[in-house]
Every structure is written in C-alpha cells, then in structure tokens.
Swiss-Prot record:
It comes from Chironomus thummi thummi. InterPro entries: Erythrocruorin, Globin, Globin-like_sf, Globin/Proto, Mb-like_M. Homodimer. Changing A48T: In second component. One of its GO terms (molecular function) is heme binding. SUPFAM superfamilies: Globin-like. Belongs to the globin family. There are at least 12 different components in Midge globin. GO terms for cellular component: extracellular region; hemoglobin complex. Heme b binds at H64, H99. Keywords: Heme, Iron, Metal-binding, Oxygen transport, Transport. Residues 6-150 form the Globin domain. This is Globin CTT-X. CDD domains: Mb-like.
Length: 151
C-alpha cells in the first residue's frame, strides 16, 4: 500500500507530545464530541436519547470515554516505529470493522476528527507544523478505517 507509511520522527514527536497534554481528559473529550455532534452520541445504545449533562459524570460514561479515547491513545503510542506498523493496521482495521457494523459513516469520523483537533488546539500550543503532523496522523488512520467502511 503506497499511501501507508509511518509518520516521520518529527511528526510523531509532535503528535505524541500534544496528545500527552490531553490524554487523561477522556471524559471531557468524549463529552465535547457528543456535545458538538449528537448524531455520534445517538450511535451509542447506552447513551442514545439521554441527556448528555445528566450522564456526563456517570461511571458508564467514564468507562466508555476511557475505552474510546484510550483506543486513540493506543494508536498515538504505536506511531513512530516501523515494527509497529502491522499492529497499527490491525488495530485500525478492527476499528473499521466494528464501526461499519454499527453504521458509522465517514462523515461521522470526520466530525470526530474536527472536534478532536479543536480540543487538541485548545489545550496545547498550536501551530501550522503541529496541525500538519496531526493531519498526517488522522489521514493515516482514516485511510485504513475508510478502506473497511467502503468494502
């Protein structure tokens, strides 16, 4: 796959450093995604139709946030080593399969990306170089996920 390659060392360093600054904000990140995009929240059977403000501080919400945002953290952690590329592809492929069965769309992944990027920008020193690194990280992830969604 000619489009699949690891990010360069500089990009990995930037992505990992900016991720580290927010990596423990799982509940706040998921809350921000759901608040901005109720259509994403509606895809979660445990939360569909519920008041976001009422569920934000519940154990169920914290567990889901940890699982969802933790997955993203796992991807970020694996970046940068050519030895991890097969593991990254498997992780992303499996994520694509799971989300395809739930009817998640490419547009909803785009909404997640948009909200996650805004959250990262708001909690880090941000510049065009960091933005480019994150664009590459999302592009690499989504190339595998979208391949599955389109199959």
């Amino acid at each position: 796959d000619p489009e699949w390659h690891t990010l360069d060392a500089h990009e990995v360093e930037q992505v990992q450093a900016t991720w580290k600054a927010v990596s423990h904000d799982e509940v706040e990140i998921l809350y921000t995604v759901f608040k901005a995009h109720p259509d994403i929240m509606a895809k979660f059977p445990k939360f569909a139709g519920k008041d976001l403000e009422a569920i934000k501080d519940t154990a169920d919400f914290a567990v889901h946030a940890s699982r969802i945002i933790g997955f993203f953290g796992e991807y970020v952690t694996l970046l940068g080593s050519s030895g991890n590329q097969a593991a990254i592809r498997t992780l992303l492929h499996d994520l694509g399969v799971f989300h395809k069965t739930r009817g998640i769309t490419k547009a909803q992944f785009g909404e997640f990306r948009e909200t996650m990027t805004a959250y990262l920008k708001g909690h880090n020193k941000w510049n065009a170089d960091i933005s480019h690194s994150w664009d590459d990280a999302f592009d690499k992830a989504f190339s595998v996920i979208f391949e599955v969604l389109e199959s």
